Design a protein with these regions (language model features):
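Short, intrinsically disordered, charge-balanced linker/junction segments flanking boundaries
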Residues: 113, 199-200
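Proline/glycine-anchored alpha-helix kink/cap motifs
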Residues: 1-21, 39-48, 86-93, 163-167, ...
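Conserved mixed alpha/beta catalytic, RNA-binding, or beta-rich assembly cores of soluble enzyme
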Residues: 29, 46, 85-183
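Phosphate/diphosphate-binding glycine-rich loops and adjacent basic-rich segments that engage nucleotide
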Residues: 1, 12, 32, 39, ...
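Acidic, glycine-rich active-site loops and adjacent beta-strand->loop/helix elements
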Residues: 23-27, 57-59
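Short acidic-glycine loop/turn motifs at beta-strand connectors
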Residues: 74-76, 141-146, 195-198
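General beta-strand structural signal in soluble alpha/beta enzymes
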Residues: 19-21, 51-55, 124
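Broad gene-expression machinery/nucleic-acid interaction feature
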Residues: 16, 50, 65-69, 134-138, ...
Length: 200
């Protein structure tokens, strides 16, 4: 969440800001990198902000070691955003990033998620060699006006199947609820919406 903390100040900088952030990019206690890239920043762009992130190296908790690079353009004023309607479902995708673990674990997680909530765009992603090991299930839904990403992380004494089903069930429940935004996006947009003023 370091990026979200720095972002409001950097939007008011005199010029382009470049950041290199190191630590945990995939941590069960916070939304993963993909959430920032695929859910949070697209919502912020609708408010007039221009920011991009790239994943140099993923860092699974508890070891971390991940690296993210960011570019943030100055923005004199954020525009209000209306998120009362999420619009029609446009696409879904399922990814299972895994590092330094047997690929069979990831494949079991993928299969269980698909059994719970089918999706045509699904794949296992073997991450580059690096510190630590880990696996997670990332299930994304994109709508006309917003997006949601459900994440579930591998943990000791929890089967891969349970992790996969949990991510799929959470997204399935979100889609069925007709809620316009997920709880993580709602939390992270509070400050930008306050800065944008009335209308958000």
């Amino acid at each position: 969440l370091l990026l979200q903390t720095l972002l409001p100040a950097l939007l008011h900088a005199d010029g382009l800001s470049r950041l290199r952030l190191e630590g945990g990019t995939h941590n069960p206690l916070a939304p993963p990198f993909e959430f920032i890239d695929r859910v949070f920043l697209p919502a912020l762009r609708r408010m007039g902000a221009e920011a991009t992130v790239s994943l140099v190296q993923s860092g699974f908790a508890p070891v971390g070691g991940g690296v993210i690079e960011c570019e943030i353009q100055p923005c004199a004023r954020l525009a209000p955003i209306d998120l009362h309607e999420r619009g029609d479902l446009a696409s879904m995708s399922l990814r299972v990033p895994i590092r330094n673990l047997n690929a069979g674990i990831g494949n079991r997680m993928l299969a269980a998620a698909l059994d719970q909530f089918p999706c045509e765009d699904a794949s296992l992603e073997i991450r580059e060699p690096g510190p630590g090991r880990g696996v997670c299930c990332l299930y994304e839904a994109r709508f006309e006006n917003t997006a949601e990403l459900s994440s579930s992380f591998g943990e000791s004494n929890v089967t891969a199947e349970r992790v996969g089903r949990r991510a799929a069930k959470n997204l399935q429940d979100f889609i069925g609820s007709q809620t316009p935004v997920g709880r993580h996006l709602a939390d992270q947009l509070l400050l930008p919406m306050a800065l944008a003023g009335s209308g958000s």
